[in-house]
Curated annotation (Swiss-Prot):
Its cofactor is Mg(2+). It comes from Schizosaccharomyces pombe (strain 972 / ATCC 24843). One of its GO terms (molecular function) is DNA binding. One of its GO terms (cellular component) is cytoplasm. SMART domains: HhH2, XPGI, XPGN. The lineage of its organism: Eukaryota, Fungi, Dikarya, Ascomycota, Taphrinomycotina. This is Uncharacterized protein C12G12.16c. CDD domains: H3TH_FEN1-XPG-like. Disulfide bonds: none annotated.
Length: 496
C-alpha cells in the first residue's frame, strides 16, 4: 500500500512539503475533503481500541467520522474501493492473500499454545504432578536441554554489527560489502542453529519417552509433543520450569495474558469489513447527509478521491496511502486519528511542494515514486529510494534511467518491468473525469454542516435505533465531541 520508502525520504529531504494545521483553523483551508473510506475503516477495525467479534464496529466508525467532521467544520465525501477486485493489482492481491494465509497459520499455532498453557494452569492449580526420585534421573537431561535452549536463543538474538549502518547516505554505498559479509555470517549461523536444533530434538524425544514411562500428567506430555513438533523455545522454557517445579501461577498467568495479546493482534490483522458492512455505512451516511460512493471498476478509492479533488469538488484527500501524492493531490495523513486528543494538529502533505524540495519536476516525482515501488510496480533489484532519487535527479526521468541501467551489468531489470511501469504511469495520470461519476456529490454544506445540532442529533438517534447501538459506545469513541448548541441538555436528547 502506497509508495514504498517515500515517507522517510520526505521527512529527511523534503520536510518543507509537510505542514501542520491546528483543528480550529482546518475548515478555513479545507472546507470539503475527499475521504479514502477503505483505509480509514480498515484502520479503525484493526485498532486495539475497537472491540473484537461485534457486529457494529462499522456503525461506530461512520458516526465517529461524522462527528469528527462536524467538530472540524469540514464536509466529507466518502469513497470506497469497488467491490470488484482491480485486475491491475492481481499480483498484489496474491501477495496479500499469501500474507493472510500465513497469519491464519500463525494464529492457529498461538491458539494451540493458549490451549496448552491453560491446561498447564489447571495442572498447576490442582498440583497434579508426580513428585519422586525421577527428578534426579532426568536432571542431566534437563540441564542439557536448558543449555541448548540458551544457545539457540543467543544465536537468534545475535545482532550483526553491519546492520548498524542505517544512515540514508551510506546505506546503499555499504550494501555490496554488507551483503557479502551477511551471507557468510548467515551461512555459518544457519549451520550452527540447525546442529543445535537436531540435538534439541533428540533430547526432547528422550524427555518425552521418560514422561510416558513415568506417568507424567497428560497435559505435560501433550505440551511436550506440541513443543517437539513446533520447536517453540518460549513454550519449552515454561515446560522445563513446570517439570522442575519452579513455575509459579503468577508467571504462568502472565504468559497466558501475553499470549492472549498476541492472539488479539493476529485476529485484528485478519479483521476486515464485509460488503454488507460497507452497504450499511452507505445507508448511515445517507441518513446523515454525507455523500458516499464506490470507485469506478478498475479505479482505486484513493485515485477516485484524488479525481474528486482535482475536479475542484474537494480541497484534499484524507488518507494514509501515499499513492495520493503520486496522483497529485494534497494528503491529510492523520485524519480521524485514533487517539483521544482532538487538539493535535493535522498533517498536510503537498505533492508539488515535495517535488520541488526534492529538486524534481512533478513528472519526475511520479517516475521516482514508481521506481520506489507501489502496488502496481516493483523495485529494480539493488535500487532503493535513495539511489532512485539520485538517478532521477541526474537523468530527469525513468526511461533515461532505464537506458543507463541497461548498460551497467550490476543492475538486472526484470523483463516485464517497463510494461508494468507504463501501465502504472497511465493509471496514476489518467484519472476519472466523467461528470456522471461525480453526480452523487451535491449541496454538501446544506446537507451536513448547515444542519442544526438538534437536527443532527435526531438523525444520529435514528441511526443508533436502526442498528441497535448504545450511545455510550459512541461517546466512548468520541470523548472530544461536544454538542455545542445543546450542552447541558444533551443527555435528555438521547433518551429513547
Amino acid at each position: 500500500m502506497g509508495v514504498h520508502g517515500l515517507l522517510p525520504i520526505i521527512r529527511k529531504v523534503a520536510s518543507e512539503g509537510i505542514r501542520w494545521l491546528q483543528p480550529e483553523f482546518f475548515s478555513k483551508y479545507y472546507p470539503v475533503l475527499a475521504v479514502d473510506g477503505n483505509l480509514l475503516l480498515y484502520r479503525f477495525f484493526r485498532s486495539p481500541n475497537t472491540p473484537l467479534h461485534t457486529n457494529y464496529q462499522h456503525v461506530l466508525w461512520a458516526l465517529k467520522l461524522s462527528r469528527y467532521c462536524r467538530k472540524l467544520k469540514t464536509s466529507p465525501i466518502v469513497v470506497f474501493d469497488n467491490l470488484k477486485p482491480n485486475d491491475f493489482k492481481a499480483e498484489e492481491h496474491e501477495k496479500r492473500s499469501l500474507i493472510s494465509s500465513q497469519i491464519v497459520n500463525q494464529r492457529q499455532v498461538v491458539q494451540e499454545q493458549m490451549y496448552f498453557l491453560c491446561n498447564l494452569k489447571n495442572c498447576l492449580i490442582d498440583n497434579n504432578f508426580p513428585t519422586g526420585n525421577f527428578y534426579y534421573e532426568i536432571g542431566p537431561l534437563l540441564s542439557q536441554i536448558g543449555k541448548l535452549l540458551f544457545d539457540l536463543r543467543s544465536l537468534n538474538e545475535r545482532d550483526n554489527p553491519f546492520h548498524a549502518q542505517n544512515n540514508a547516505e551510506n546505506l546503499e554505498n555499504a550494501t555490496f560489502v554488507r551483503l557479502i559479509v551477511d551471507k557468510l555470517n548467515d551461512r555459518e549461523k544457519t549451520l550452527m542453529i540447525q546442529e543445535k536444533k537436531n540435538h534439541l530434538i533428540h533430547s526432547l524425544r528422550q524427555l518425552l519417552a521418560f514422561s510416558e514411562i513415568n506417568d507424567f500428567p497428560s497435559e505435560i506430555r501433550s505440551y511436550l509433543e506440541f513443543i517437539l513438533s513446533n520447536l517453540d523455545l518460549e513454550c519449552l522454557t515454561l515446560c522445563l520450569k513446570i517439570i522442575k517445579g519452579i513455575l509459579t501461577l503468577d508467571e504462568l498467568q502472565k504468559a497466558i495474558k501475553l499470549k492472549q495479546t498476541e492472539l488479539d493482534k493476529l485476529e485484528r490483522r485478519l479483521y476486515r469489513p464485509s460488503p454488507q458492512n460497507i452497504f450499511e455505512i452507505f445507508e448511515i451516511l445517507k441518513i446523515l447527509g454525507i455523500p458516499a460512493s464506490f470507485s469506478p471498476i478498475g479505479v482505486e478509492a484513493e485515485a477516485f478521491a484524488s479525481a474528486i479533488s482535482q475536479n475542484n469538488l474537494a480541497y484534499a484527500v484524507a488518507t494514509q496511502d501515499t499513492d495520493v501524492l503520486l496522483l497529485g493531490s494534497s494528503m491529510i495523513s492523520n485524519f480521524l486519528d485514533l487517539n483521544d486528543n482532538f487538539h493535535l494538529p493535522l498533517q498536510i502533505m503537498d505533492p508539488r511542494k515535495i517535488a520541488q524540495e526534492l529538486n524534481l519536476t512533478f513528472d519526475g516525482f511520479q517516475d521516482y515514486c514508481l521506481m520506489c515501488g507501489t502496488d502496481f510496480t516493483s523495485r529494480i533489484p539493488k535500487i532503493g529510494p535513495v539511489r532512485a532519487l539520485k538517478l532521477i535527479r541526474y537523468y530527469g526521468n525513468a526511461f533515461d534511467v532505464l537506458k543507463a541501467l541497461n548498460v551497467e551489468e550490476k543492475y538486472i531489470i526484470p523483463t516485464d518491468y517497463i510494461k508494468k511501469f507504463l501501465t502504472a504511469k497511465k493509471l496514476f495520470t489518467d484519472l476519472p473525469s466523467n461528470n456522471e461519476l461525480f453526480s452523487f456529490i451535491h449541496n454538501i454544506p446544506k446537507e451536513f454542516l448547515h444542519l442544526s445540532d438538534s437536527t443532527y442529533l435526531d438523525l444520529e438517534k435514528q441511526v443508533l435505533r436502526i442498528f441497535n447501538v448504545q450511545i455510550e459506545e459512541l461517546d466512548a469513541k468520541t470523548p472530544w465531541y461536544y454538542h455545542y448548541e445543546l450542552e447541558k441538555d444533551v443527555k435528555s436528547t438521547y433518551e429513547y
